[in-house]
Design a protein with these regions (language model features):
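P-loop NTPase switch/communication element
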Residues: 1-14
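AMP-binding/adenylate-forming
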Residues: 13-18, 30, 35-42
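Active-site beta-alpha connecting loops in nucleotide-dependent enzymes
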Residues: 174-176, 193-263
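Short, glycine/acidic-enriched loop or turn micro-motifs at the edges of active sites
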Residues: 21, 46, 81-82, 194-196, ...
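Switch II (G3) loop of P-loop NTPases
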Residues: 12-27, 189-195
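Acidic, Mg2+-coordinating active-site environments of NTP-dependent enzymes
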Residues: 38-188, 213-214, 239-248, 256-263
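Alpha-helix C-terminal capping segments
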Residues: 7-8, 32-34, 151-157, 207-212
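Residue-level marker for buried hydrophobic side chains located in beta-strands
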Residues: 15, 75, 189, 218-219
Length: 263
């Protein structure tokens, strides 16, 4: 992130940076460098639980950014994370925008979600607008992320048409995350092995299940950095996999065996 800041010039209007962390105090340090005005917390899963102790610890580390946001700013959060972040909301002076499914009653919601094999779409409802969004990515988790992006984009006065065009033409910047590799004889390889965690693995399995009735094969390995959630995290994936009806399962690693046992 600091290297990115050195490339700014007088023409830069908006800078988007990722603040990654594996421990307490790291986002605090990055905020002192970047001075964010708006923020998104894409989710509070179990990644890095080994270092942060618990999901509540992960929430504490990610919400360190709250105290740096100005009153004129905004932060977009998932409604499903409300219980985890609520203890730290008193530190946030910025406007909090809750995002969710329409049934959950957030300020920015999705409805009529359609998840196709290699794309997704939904209707976005906001206090001042309702519009349709097409995403060039498969998976419900991309819809959730798009809601968060939309909430902050509107907070900085980006137009609805620009939001639609931007989301519709988005590209993945990370390797080994939901990479689609077409193969011979109409086969498709989905590579989502970068620092996998239970939430990301479940999301990928949902995408894979969307290709049925074509034969589906899941090749799953160990998930690391889960700490006390190590066994339950793998078991959770196994239970979900059983519900999705994947045809064949290959497990690589002693932890991944737990997935197979629960299937």
């Amino acid at each position: 992130m600091p290297l990115t800041l050195t490339r700014l010039d007088e023409k830069t209007e908006i800078l988007i940076v990722e603040m990654g962390m594996t421990g307490f105090g790291e986002i605090d340090f990055l905020c002192q460098i970047a001075h964010p005005t708006h923020a998104i917390i894409t989710g509070i899963g179990l990644v890095h639980a080994e270092y942060l102790g618990s999901q509540q610890g992960i929430a504490r580390a990610k919400t360190e950014l709250f105290r740096y946001l100005p009153e004129s700013g905004a932060v977009a959060l998932r409604e499903k994370d409300r219980a985890l972040v609520t203890p730290y909301l008193d530190e946030c002076k910025a406007n909090v925008i809750w995002c969710s499914d329409a049934a959950d009653g957030g300020a920015v919601t999705s409805e009529n979600v359609v998840l196709a094999a290699e794309k997704s779409s939904f209707d976005c409802h906001m206090p001042d607008a309702t519009f349709h969004v097409e995403l060039p990515f498969a998976g419900r988790h991309y819809v959730d992320n798009a809601l968060l992006v939309t909430a902050v984009a509107r907070a900085i006065d980006i137009s609805v048409s620009d939001i639609q065009n931007g989301l519709g033409s988005a590209v993945s910047l990370s390797s080994s995350r939901m990479e689609m590799h077409p193969l011979a004889e109409d086969r498709l390889l989905i590579n989502d092995c970068y620092n996998a965690n239970p939430d990301s693995m479940i999301a990928t399995l949902d995408v894979l299940a969307g290709y049925k009735p074509r034969p589906t094969i899941a090749c799953l390995g160990n998930m690391y950095e889960l700490g006390q959630y190590e066994v339950e995290g793998h078991a959770k994936v196994g239970r979900h996999l059983a519900e999705r009806g994947i045809d064949w399962l290959i497990c690589l690693g002693t932890l991944a065996e737990i997935i197979g046992e629960k299937r």
